[in-house]
Amino acid sequence: EWSLDEQVTMIAQAGFDGIDISAQHPDESRAARHLMRDAGLSCTCYAFPDSVSGFQRDVDLALELEAQHLNLIIQIFPVSVSEGVDVIGRLLEIGRQSGLPLTVETHRNCITTDLLYTLQLMEGLPDMAISADISHYVVEREFTWPVPERDEAWMQQILARAVAFQGRVASREQIQIQLDFPQHQGWVSKHLQWWEDGMRHWRAREPADTKLNFLTQLGPPPYAITGRDGYELSDRWQESITIMNWVREIWQRLEKNSKPEQR
């Protein structure tokens, strides 16, 4: 197990620009942020708000940590769309009043668990900024292969609204699959296409001086699949570097192919 200091050093030396840290563990996050400043790394934060009344604490910590934005995995579970719109609207208003950009992540076991419900939330909240972790919907909807046109159209709506992205590759039954296994290459290619589509939407919409955050998010077990011996079947650290390089290649290709007036 690497120490916090070792982790920050490795991340900086590998060429990453920043780290996403938790608003749930203030002391650990403050310690990490101190090391990140010394290493020249920027910061985003994530939180799991389970009430509107307690959300200001998450916002205050993210501001203290100088987070570029606070990403929300909202642990409030309304049944109706109108209730969901009300809850998220109140959270977004707290962010606005505090001057902190907020994103709402597409994630299972939270308010955006269901793809179709999330699309309705987006319609009711035109100013809701999406952080797109599309792997969750691949599993949640159990997309068949090849992905049907109907499901592709739904996914494109998510990508068109995304202001940030999170990178792991899923299959219809597994949330995080190994990147170099031959049997996974169809899903790898599909996620690369989705990320490129999302970044193309973003570039067409956002001002030229806006920063796009792409988080290489590869979770430990049980996200990571393990063998009988309990050890993971791939090296998540090396896979995170692989995803970083893929995303930068996509960005450079989009940059090269864009017209000067577009950016």
Question: How would you describe each model-predicted region?
Answer:
Residues 42-130, 139:
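Active-site acidic/histidine proton-transfer and metal-coordination neighborhood
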Residues 7-9, 29-33, 55-60, 85-92, ...:
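Generic structural signal for well-ordered alpha-helices
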Residues 1, 22-24, 46-50, 75-77, ...:
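Active-site beta-loop-alpha junctions enriched in small/polar residues
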Residues 97-182:
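Acidic/histidine-rich catalytic cores of soluble enzymes
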Residues 1-63, 67-68, 241, 245-263:
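N-terminal pre-domain/capping segments
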Residues 122, 181-200, 222-241:
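Short, electropositive alpha-helical surface patch
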Residues 150-153, 187-211:
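A short, acidic, amphipathic alpha-helical segment used as a generic capping/interface helix at domain edges
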Residues 19-21, 41-47, 70-72, 102-104, ...:
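Hydrophobic faces of well-ordered beta-strands that scaffold small-molecule active sites
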